[in-house]
Amino acid sequence: MIVRDHKDAEASAVDEDKFISRRYTLRADGMGHSVHETYIKPGQALHMWYKNHKESVICIEGEGQIEDLTEGGSWELKPGVLYALDKHQKHILSSEKGMTVLCVFTPSLVGPEDHDAEGSYPLYDDDGSLIKH
């Protein structure tokens, strides 16, 4: 059994300019997915495209908006609202006052990934070698 708390996740956190991602489970845990708690900093709009991963996201605190740039549409996010990027949609995630979301990635992240110029995470092998950018 894996049991981790917020302090454990802080040790593997990635702090980018627009958000902080605390990673609770990663590839080495063998779960087939990774679980992250991500805080979107106030006034941010993140342009993303997870071309190598699928992601499910549920808002747990604050409010924001998700805009689907691939299929169209925009939705308000508040605690309890989930969205899933089932077709690798390009999207913009934004929040005026800050928002915390719980994210599940498949395949799981290795750990140190951060977004590239396209807003995507590269795909790494178990040993940390790059498979696909």
Regions found by a protein language model. Name each.
Residues 52-65:
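Glycine- and acidic-residue-biased ligand/ion/polar-headgroup-sensing regions
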Residues 34-51:
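Conserved short histidine dyad/triad with adjacent acidic residue
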Residues 1-33, 118-133:
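A short, N-terminal "cap"/entry segment at the start of jelly-roll beta-barrel domains
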Residues 65, 87-114:
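Ligand-binding loop in jelly-roll beta-barrel domains
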Residues 36-38, 57, 102:
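Conserved hydrophobic/aromatic positions in well-ordered beta-strands
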Residues 71-88:
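Short acidic-glycine-tyrosine-enriched beta hairpin
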Residues 37, 74-76, 90, 98:
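Well-ordered beta-strand positions in beta-sheet-rich domains
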